[in-house]
Amino acid sequence: SGPEWNRHEFNAENIKPRDLYETYLPPFEALVKEGKVKEVMCAYNRFEGDPCCGSDRLLMQILRDEWGFDGIVLSDCGAIADFYRDYGHKTHLDAESASAAAVLSGTDLECGSSYEALVEAVKQGKIDEKAVDVAVKRLLMARFALGEMDEPEKVSWTGIPFSVVASAGHDSLALDMARKSMTLLMNKDNTLPLKRGGLTIAVMGPNANDSVMQWGNYNGMPPHTVTILDGIRKALGSDDRLIYEQGCGWVERAQIQSVFNRCKTADGKPGFTARYWNNVTRDGEPVTTAQVTTPFHFCTSGATVFAPGVNLTDFSATYNSVFTPDQSGEVVFDIYAYGSGRLRINGEEVRGFSNQHGGQKSAYTLQVQAGKMYDVELDFEYFRSDALLNFDLGFKNEVDVRKSVERVKDADVVVFVGGVSPNLEGEEMGVELPGFRGGDRTDIELPAVQRELIAALHHAGKKVVLVNCSGSPIGLEPETGRCGAILQAWYPGQAGGTAVAEVLFGDYNPAGRLPVTFYRNVS
């Protein structure tokens, strides 16, 4: 599908038939023929000059004719608009031409608004109404199969109660999945399992106390998450001692130490009070209110609303809290948004942001005094699809490797929880950092700042266990000589901290296997 940063204009061309049929197509073919999927999504990029959602070769000849697929083809969100907009492929003149071409090539359903032009396309003779009927029939057949036209009592899954969400059975399943995914890459000299009883353990690294990292991409929002730090802390015996020292961030030499937990609402509840309106002007009463207890990670991609009852488009939100720092210094209010809004401190607007074409980072630095209360209000509005709002606040600290090593000098073992994060690797992200571009990774090595800290711990004579969290391979060649054990924990979900701790202390025997090759280094 091409690089994330230019996929709206990228052209995959001169693909040899052998590569196409032996490398790129087999996973899709298996899902269609063996998995019997009912819906297939076409990509943003071009294939041999044609946008994938307008490719007869892919959607008609291969998918429908060769593989016999008779289900729905859905565009990726905004992909049809890429046919004609300036920052897209520009293969078509307008929405009418693009929509007609997509339907004629077999794209039945659009995620976006370009298909609104189909009525005019029919009037202009760019597509026959009978061709539109073919797509409409497929869509209606799918809705019939889902029971959308039947009485609720006739549809088996309408009787499933909401209480199954986050039920005990599902919590147990989350733990079981996390356990089974744990993959022990290396264990020298019986470094693992760790022995309880008078143990002093240091937990370090950017992923040790990050619940959001554990959720991965396109995730739900679990009501509770056991971080890896939490899991280790709960697994210790009464005679054991834990030292927590983050040490560094993922990539940058300056790290923000979150103080989100110092935010409380006016009635004393943790986090922010959220109010939502199904319009961008905040007319009328809010349609819903909610409590946000963790740093914000909201996104409407995949038809995920910010809160139950809130529109996917044409909505607004206001978040309020009182921040009371326990130390003085400079606090960074960190915003990453796809939409418009403003940040107010004590009623004064200190930062505005507006971006309707992808995510944009915005930050504000405030000198705070310990014990003083600061009213924080964040507004957000969006009227199109794919709204995004990430927000956190914290003290910005420069990485000091020497001091971090000194702080864990009494530890018998250091568990370094590192790797990368869904905030760095994912779909079309506004990330431009060493080793990362737009959601892609440009280097498979462990980020340099983490590598430096692990090396310093090794040189100080510390026994190091590396817990690597990532959704893709990491080159770990230097770490194999500097660590006693390496555990690949992936993005382990809401119960990930419990599963990692069970492996570290020998309460669960890891049996996971790598589904992808972990190369030793980039060469």
Where are the model-predicted features located?
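Glycoside hydrolase catalytic-domain context in secreted enzymes
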Residues: 1-523
